[in-house]
């Protein structure tokens, strides 16, 4: 029930205790206090009846996103943080109670006109869906949690491709030789790019995983290293994984840990490594090659070495064969060679 108290300042204090809700607020007039208390009691009645609280008329999409961000246990990654800013910019002023398929249709129109592709727009809607789902289940608000997912599913009817194009590019031996020779001739090259690239080829690790490795994560006796917060579609944090360091990788790591004793194995900015790799490719006229393609080459080499799916998955961190398959690049002649070797 609601109680009202006249404060010495002349303002009115409303307090609502009902169905597990205990909230209070101060207002200039008793009428405002009563109106607020009535709305809060209505929410309590909805919750008590096993339903969800009605969305307050004044709450906007941006308000809900702000609450979602504040409730997060850790900071968002760069992509998610940028998407949340974009959502607040594009539809943030929309009243949450007015959010519907037409609003999202117009949002998609604007994104498409701005040059965003189907994959990007689908990701935008997936992030929005996560916010709506959180609002419904964490805040018990009567929100259409599947709204964004339904609009996402409709993108195909617009002719938008929502599946990212799978790359099958991997560097050739000749390309790698040219790139390494390019860095050898650079006296001002501060980042040991050849060493980092060879480590990527020997481990199949992502660029961010390489730059996060610390000496303390290495078990010299077991020749393993722990990758902290390894990428996982369900768990962004706490997904630590210990992986073996194969001979080529151990040959790189062993002198580093002996020399340093502590700290990062490769204390360089991820963006700087990527930029250096891109500049080298541009200078040499090597087209459509990215640092991440070294991971593709590594995964393919693991299979060519005769490792099975479980072993390669442990090295690369892929959870399923469907995720790993795009990196294999197994050729028909590889199958023939494997049979001959058997």
Predicted feature locations:
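Short, Arg/Lys-rich segments that mark the N-terminal edge of DNA/RNA- and chromatin-recognition modules
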Residues: 1-28, 66-67
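Active-site/catalytic core of tyrosine-dependent DNA strand-transfer enzymes
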Residues: 131, 174-176, 246-287
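Catalytic-site neighborhood detector that most strongly recognizes the C-terminal catalytic loop/helix
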Residues: 170, 229-233, 250, 271, ...
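N-terminal core-binding DNA-recognition domain of tyrosine site-specific recombinases/integrases
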Residues: 23-28, 66-140, 165-168, 186-191, ...
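C-terminal catalytic core of tyrosine-transesterase DNA break-rejoin enzymes
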Residues: 198, 202-209, 279, 283, ...
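Conserved tyrosine-mediated DNA breakage-rejoining catalytic core shared by Y-recombinases
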Residues: 148-153, 175, 208, 212-255
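N-terminal helical hairpins
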Residues: 26-58, 62, 70, 74-77, ...
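Basic, Lys/Arg- and aromatic-enriched nucleic-acid-binding interface segment
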Residues: 118-126, 137, 141-207, 211, ...
């Amino acid at each position: 029930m609601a109680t009202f108290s006249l404060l010495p300042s002349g303002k009115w204090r409303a307090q609502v205790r009902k169905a597990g809700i205990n909230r209070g607020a101060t207002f200039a007039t008793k009428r405002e206090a009563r109106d607020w208390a009535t709305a809060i009691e209505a929410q309590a009645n909805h919750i008590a009846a096993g339903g969800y609280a009605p969305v307050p008329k004044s709450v906007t999409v941006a308000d809900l996103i702000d609450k979602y961000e504040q409730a997060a246990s850790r900071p968002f990654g760069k992509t998610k943080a940028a998407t949340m800013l974009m959502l607040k910019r594009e539809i943030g002023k929309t009243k949450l109670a007015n959010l519907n398929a037409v609003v999202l249709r117009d949002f998609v129109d604007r994104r498409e006109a701005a040059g965003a592709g189907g994959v990007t727009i689908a990701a935008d809607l997936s992030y929005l869906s996560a916010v709506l789902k959180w609002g419904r289940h964490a805040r018990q608000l009567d929100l259409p949690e599947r709204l964004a997912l339904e609009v996402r599913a409709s993108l195909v009817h617009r002719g938008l491709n929502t599946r990212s194009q799978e790359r099958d590019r991997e560097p050739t031996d000749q390309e790698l030789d040219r790139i390494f020779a390019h860095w050898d001739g650079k006296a001002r090259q501060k980042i040991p790019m050849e060493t980092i690239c060879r480590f990527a080829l020997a481990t199949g690790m992502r660029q961010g995983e390489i730059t996060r490795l610390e000496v303390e994560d290495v078990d010299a006796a077991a020749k393993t290293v722990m990758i902290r917060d390894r990428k996982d579609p369900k768990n962004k944090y706490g997904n630590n994984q210990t992986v073996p360091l194969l001979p080529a990788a151990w040959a790189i790591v062993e002198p580093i840990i002996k020399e340093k004793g502590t700290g990062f194995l490769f204390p360089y900015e991820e963006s700087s490594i990527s930029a250096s790799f891109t500049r080298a490719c541009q200078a040499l006229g090597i087209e459509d090659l990215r640092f991440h393609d070294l991971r593709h080459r590594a995964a393919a080499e693991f299979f060519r070495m005769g490792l099975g799916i479980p072993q390669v998955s442990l090295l690369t961190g892929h959870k399923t064969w469907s995720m790993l398959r795009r990196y294999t690049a197994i050729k028909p002649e590889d199958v023939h060679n494997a049979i001959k070797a058997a």
